[in-house]
Amino acid sequence: HEEWQLLRNLGLKNPPHPILGRYKWPGIYTPFKHQLTTAAFLAANPRCYCLSEPGTGKTNASAWAADYLLTKKLVKRVLVVCPVSIMDTAWRADLFRTLMHRSVGIASGTKRQREAVIAADYEFVIINFDGVKVVHQALMAGGFDLVIIDEATSVKNAQTERWKALNAICKPGVRVWAMTGTPAAQSPLDAYGLAKLVRPESVPRSYTQWRDRVMVKITQFKWTPHANSKDMVREVLQPAIRYTKEECLDLPDLLYTTRELELSPQQKKYYEQVKTHMVALAAGEEITAANAATLINKLAQIAQGAVYADTGEVIQFDIKDRLAELMEVVNSTDHKVLVFVPYRHVSDMLRDALAEELGDPHAVEVIRGGVPATQRADIIKRFQTEDKTKVLLLAPAAAGHGITLTRADQIVWWGPTTSVELYIQCNARAHRAGQTNKVTVTHLQSSP
């Protein structure tokens, strides 16, 4: 590593990084070519961005790079900051499969529980964004000299307490790698918070100065992006590495991921009531396949956001966290998104919520039982040939066979289906002949 650093100091622009020749690449996965390049890039740049598309294996590439730095004693301890939904299913699980020789702790739960994890001697500590401000002092004293920020657009706003708490931990001398596939998806203004966190010298001191640089004032309250705003964003978010899924030629065509979510307090209450009823049945009455299926159905409905009460009315639950996860997927792609929703009342609720989030009722369409064949054909045609529809909500049973929806490169399962055949068939709506992109299947999971 010292020889490589010397070559860089002498002005050699891109000497091959020693990770490519001397590192053993532990774990159950063989790294893809783009992951080798990404890991070398991260190891070479103390403050940088990995802007590769979702599904390209950023987690493992950064894990290998961090492990290399730990092995060379260039860093002592790693803090991973990411959304709650991927703390366990993505980060802990991938670190276990990739770096089984390293110790990993998840700082979750109460303040005291989080502090105990930070005070222990785990080499990797994983924490969610809002947890950072809860145990801010403990993190400051925790000896973290590498901070990996995953889904970094969660801290795009430099005015928030969340951003300020994280910024204090990313003090001079600490390595910071920010990872996101969508650095300024909504607006060039979004790049400011990221740049100020990773390389503050790359942007003006004030947000107003940045706004005046990348936006043009139309009226007193309306601004529009400057014609060169994309170039300006690219300029400040450097050094950066980015791969699209299509550039990763050795990636499988169909990728799977799971995002874990907490149930809301109201959902937990109803969920426990139904479970208690099931236990009571098991203790006394005879359980038939029919009443067992009904109760399991009820649990699935509660987890997904709306349930039929015995009176026939629909009880709706707070789905803002689940919706936020879905919107992250929607915003992560320039293409379209299929969302499989098993229950009619949930799809009604979701259609309205998505239309509001996207600011256009025509951006969301629904196919399910009861939609006439001619209307269904029109929806599919519009989805495949026009740009207006961004999200298509589908009942799995209504979309299992024969439909081509290859304009989508993201599939989200809002809730599970009990039929493996139906699951495979539904995923094949997008992953089929005519698909020119790699397809990612995301499972939203929130049952306790």
Where are these regions (language model features)?
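Inter-lobe coupling linker of SF2 helicases/translocases
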Residues: I126-G131, Q137-A141, E161-V174, A178-M179, ...
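Conserved pre-motif I regulatory segment
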Residues: P15-L51
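Conserved two-lobed SF2 helicase motor
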Residues: A120-V135, T385-G400
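SF2 helicase/translocase ATPase core recognition
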Residues: V174-T208, C248-K275, L394-P448
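Walker A/P-loop
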Residues: N45-A65
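Conserved Walker A/P-loop ATP-binding site and its immediately adjacent core
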Residues: A61, L74-L95, A185-D190, Y343-R344
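Conserved helix-turn-beta segment of the N-terminal RecA-like "Helicase ATP-binding" lobe
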Residues: I86-T110, V198-E201, E357-L358
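Conserved helicase ATPase core of P-loop NTP-dependent helicases/translocases
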Residues: Q113-A116, L338-F340, D348-M349, A355, ...
